[in-house]
Structures are given as structure tokens and as C-alpha cells.
Amino acid sequence: MDVNPTLLFLKIPAQNAISTTFPYTGDPPYSHGTGTGYTMDTVNRTHQYSEKGKWTTNTETGAPQLNPIDGPLPEDNEPSGYAQTDCVLEAMAFLEESHPGIFENSCLETMEVVQQTRVDRLTQGRQTYDWTLNRNQPAATALANTIEVFRSNGLTANESGRLIDFLKDVMESMDKEEIEITTHFQRKRRVRDNMTKKMVTQRTIGKKKQRVNKRSYLIRALTLNTMTKDAERGKLKRRAIATPGMQIRGFVYFVETLARSICEKLEQSGLPVGGNEKKAKLANVVRKMMTNSQDTELSFTITGDNTKWNENQNPRMFLAMITYITKNQPEWFRNILSIAPIMFSNKMARLGKGYMFESKRMKLRTQIPAEMLASIDLKYFNESTRKKIEKIRPLLIDGTASLSPGMMMGMFNMLSTVLGVSILNLGQKKYTKTTYWWDGLQSSDDFALIVNAPNHEGIQAGVDRFYRTCKLVGINMSKKKSYINRTGTFEFTSFFYRYGFVANFSMELPSFGVSGINESADMSIGVTVIKNNMINNDLGPATAQMALQLFIKDYRYTYRCHRGDTQIQTRRSFELKKLWEQTRSKAGLLVSDGGPNLYNIRNLHIPEVCLKWELMDEDYQGRLCNPLNPFVSHKEIESVNNAVVMPAHGPAKSMEYDAVATTHSWIPKRNRSILNTSQRGILEDEQMYQKCCNLFEKFFPSSSYRRPVGISSMVEAMVSRARIDARIDFESGRIKKEEFSEIMKICSTIEELRRQKQ
């Protein structure tokens, strides 16, 4: 970018420039290779923090498990996971006392959700551990596979389409002595190619039925697959994140629904709201503390950091919290909510792909799968890896590690926030019974603590008491990484507060630029990002105008669509020049067709096609927006699309932008290299499921009808619908008798084929 950075700082106060010190420009770091090492680190660290707990063995799976609950109270500042049950329950009781009826009301709201949620709720989300294939899959495919397996094993409650009925099947599946699954495998054979007469490897994909006994099934059902967290800025080391399987997901969803409902009612919770709403909520708490700290009181704020939040949380503690929160509720509701924490207390972490070995001398590479780590000779590994493996060995079963304590990242964000807020709640004067008092904000593992007291000693005493109270519930405030300031300056979830929130503009930098979806979407997303930042992030008019010019420049270079009258030569310039010369109204050409840019900061809210429509030549309009044009992939034309925008920090955000379908809204085809691998069978299944879904939507155009999950139930629904429609059409004379009987014949054939398949 040809911008002199010093110009940006001429007229802004220093605290506004803090955001430019962030590692947010440029590409974020990605991980390569396997996540096995990072996962072992997580498992070993988690056990180390709880090492003084009690060891037991799971009777079903034989996995060794460590239980640190009610363990020894810490004597030093090292992080530890020894939460005390009675302290957690007491914190919950005080939270309820300060917010009468909060748990009761949230339970009622959740009960309603539990009874209404459909099983297709689980198709949301990206990669999911698919226990039938023992690898990650898109959520919809993983769910379809699970349901297919359940049905072929006689578990059919899920056919009602309600999530709660699917969860009944999950519970029953765990009691079965064995389960039959279909797996994909790959055969390789050497054959001679007729054309070249060379030997080539031919791959064929097969499916085979396999029986899994109760123990192996339970291990799979309790497994969290692990991957490396990508694109994390400001860190030297990568870390592992977990993706749970379909058995756990539904239960977690209900627990988080309950916790979300509680968080919405707590003024100290930074979840589930975001953006400007969150800023307003936080500003309220700060205002309260500053108005209450009369002239006699001091007020200080800690920008807090917790050490290894997830690894010191404990599912058994969450079970205690849920038991308390649901204390007067119906038995079925209490049971369904307690299953998630119980499953997490028995969870297994899958170690990923294993290690890759390379011999430079012999040019050989070989992969040691995670399953072999239990038995392989350790002389091949370097010292640090050897230590890791030695430590983890007692915990290994079938390539997964037993991991009872700890929570893994991002599983119970809402519920852990409730725990954090319950400690902030204890800072009221009626509980501290002394001259100091505290309040604050909590959002998952991030917190800000505001302490008020008559003098510095009081502030110190307040902070110490908060620190010790946290230790009792397994929260470890880091003394090294937290810092304290006079109230009025602090940071919370990357929002910087200085007598009001300062716009942290650099957070948004990565989302500027060309997304690379297609010409139409990229233009729309680019201007929407600039518009949104003018609204939310103090992006001033001059800077916005500059951002817009840079974006257009970037866009033209990306798609090689410089103006038709430019001197720049690219692969497209010949065609674009020709178009420019034939066009009467040149202002009507889209930027991607070599036209001029008509955007300025006043009209960013208008899609480019609409902005230029009146200026376009008629034949250009006809080519651009013609549903019969074979290059336009018209999905249904929605007025609003969602783009995934990467802010520099936190999860990818979904951002709405206006979508006008034109010849520029193409969808790229999938990379073909996958077709030669063992993933191919899985890909074919996925495509089949996709085709089936598309067909289904043609049969049931009404959006009020929710589609069932799994191919078999969809086929049943379509066949019966076809019969009904055919009968109505026949009786009203819209189709002839021959056509009617042909439709009936096809329906019977489909059913017959399905019976044979089963």
C-alpha cells in the first residue's frame, strides 16, 4: 500500500494508536503437519494441573481417569484444577439470591427449546468428528451417517425429527452389545496400462460392514477429534482444538442453551451479545462502579488474564452447577442436561494423524499413526517428544488418550461464563462484609475486574480475596499477565476502554480487501466492509475514501479488469477493450467488465448492478442479468447473502451483503485431486446426500416443511409425496392414466430396490 504511516498519527491521541501495535496485518500463521504433538501437550498439561487428584478406572472402557475435584487447596500461585464442590454450589446459591428466579426462568425457556428443536440443528457447524469413519466430516454428512447407522441397528426414535428423540437413540446405542457400521476402504493393485505399457497403481474404493463391540463403540462415542487451531495471531506456539462427535453435540447444545439463557440475564456477562450491544453493556458496569466510587473511594481495574482456563475447568464441576440450577425441575430435564458433563468426564482425545518420519539419507518418509505410539520403541524420537510420549502412555487406548479433567477449547463457553460471573457477583458489599467491593465483566475466559476501596491497602486486599475465591472453583488468575490501572483505562475481549470504548480499528484490517469468492460477491463484500467500519469503528470519511480507492485498485488487479481505456496489458485486456469500444454508455459497465468506479462513501449501500442499471446499454443489461445465460448459476436469488469475514481475532464473523445474481456470480468447481484418494467414496456419499437434498427441495417447495435427515427418510417422504401428487393430478385430469400408472410403477420399483438393499 502506498500510504505513509506517519500521516495517520498527526492528529490522534496516543491511546487511539495502540491498535496499530497489534500483529494484525499480513497473513496469519497456519499450521502444517499433524496436531499430535499439540494434543499430547494439552493432555499432559491438563493432568499435571490436577495431579494430586484421585485415579480411578472407567469400568466400561478401561480408561484410567483422574478426578481432582475437592482435591488439596493450592499452597502456591501455580495453576491448579482442584475446584471445591461446596464452594461452587455456594457461589451458585448467592448468584440466585442476587437474581431471584433467574435459574427457574432459564430452565423454563430451555425446556421449551428442548421440546421444539429439530435434529437438523446439528447440521450447523463445520468439521465434526464422524465416528463411523473415524475422521472429520462436514456436520451434515456426519449426522446423516450416524442416523443411517442407528437405523440399520434398529434405533428409530430419531425418525420423528426431534433432536430429543435422536438423543434417546444415542443413549440406547450405548447399551447395545454391538453396533454394525459401514466403512470405506481402499484397495490398491498394480496393473499394466494398455496405452503406455507401464505398471500403474489402480485404486478401488470399497465399502464393508464392520461390527463394533460395546467397548469400542463407547470409546468412539466419547472421542473428541483434535486439530491445530489455525490463523492465530500473536503467538509463537500453535495449540490444539477439539471437535466432538454427533453423540456429544446434541447434549452440549442443550446445556449451552440453558447457560446462554442465564448469561442474557446477567449484566456482567460479555456473552452471548457482541459488537455495539456488548460495548453498551460493559460501559454500564464501568459507569456504575465510577459513580459509586464517591470522592472518598479509589477505583482500580484489572485487565485480567486466566492461566489455561479450559485445562483447569472440570466437567464434574459443571455437573454440580447443572444439578443446582435445575434443582426443582422435572426428572427428564435434569437427566438430559447432566449427560453432557458426564460424557465430558469420560472423554477421550484422539491424537490425530501421528508423526511423520523422514530419512534424508534414504529419501524415505513414513508415518507413525497415533495407534502405534503405545508400543513403538522411543529411540526414534527426540528428547522432548520422548518425554511427551512416556507421560501419555498410561492413558492411551486405541490411539486415543483418556482425558477426564479439563474441558477442551470452546465447548462450554456459556456455562463457564456463568461460573466466572458467580465469583464477580460475590464482590457486593453485602458479601465481602468489609470496606472493599468489586464488580466486573466476564466473557468465557476473559475478564475485567473493577475493585473499589477507601485506600490502596483495601484495593490490594480486595484483589487478593478475588484471586483466592477464584482458586476455590478452579479459576486461576495469572498474576504475571494481568495488570491494574486506575478505572477508566482497561481492555476486555480486545475492546479498549478509555473513558469510553476506543475503536480498535486494526482488528478489522484483515477483512479489508478482495475475498476471492467471485467478482460479484467480492465487490459487494468489499464495499460493505468499508460501510460497516464507518458505522461501527470510527473509520473517518477521508480514510474511508482512501480505503475505497485502494480496494478498487486491489479488485482490478485481482480480476485483471482494468478500465477499458487503460494502458495496462493483462490476459483480459483485449476482450475488455473490445467491450469498452462497443459500449455506448461506458459508465454502465461494471468494474469487473472494465467499467469506471462509481462508488463513493455516500452510495456504498447500493449494489453495483443497481447503481449502474439506468446507465447500462440494453443489450448489456440483457447479457448481465439473463436467467437463461448458461454461465449464471442461479441458485434461488436471495436479496441478502452471508459472507464469512475474518476479523483479526476471534472466530470468523458472518456478514450480510446485498446479492444481485448476474453473470459474475459464478461458483468455482471443486478441486479434482481428491478423486484419486480414499476420500473419494466419502465424497461420493456426500454428493449423493447433496443431490438427494436438492431433489427433496423440489418435491417440497414449501419452506415450512423441514427436511428429514438421512437419505432413507428423505426417499420415503418423496415417494409418498409423489404418489399423493400423482393421484391428485390424475383425478383432476392434469395427467393421463398411462402417466399415472408409470409414476406408480416407478415408486414401487424404488421401494423394492430399497428393500433389497436392506
Curated annotation (Swiss-Prot):
Compartment(s) of residence: Host nucleus; Host cytoplasm
Residue numbers spanned by region Promoter-binding site: 249-256
InterPro entries: RNA-dir_pol_NSvirus, RNA_pol_PB1_influenza
tRNA processing keyword on record: no
Catalyses which reaction(s): RNA(n) + a ribonucleoside 5'-triphosphate = RNA(n+1) + diphosphate
Naturally occurring in which organism (per UniProt): Influenza A virus (strain A/Memphis/18/1978 H3N2)
Catalytic activity, EC: 2.7.7.48
Name of the encoding gene: PB1
UniProt biased composition (Polar residues): 55-64
Motif placement: Nuclear localization signal: 187-195, 203-216
Domain named RdRp catalytic: residues: 286-483
Enzyme type, top EC level: transferase
Record protein name field: RNA-directed RNA polymerase catalytic subunit
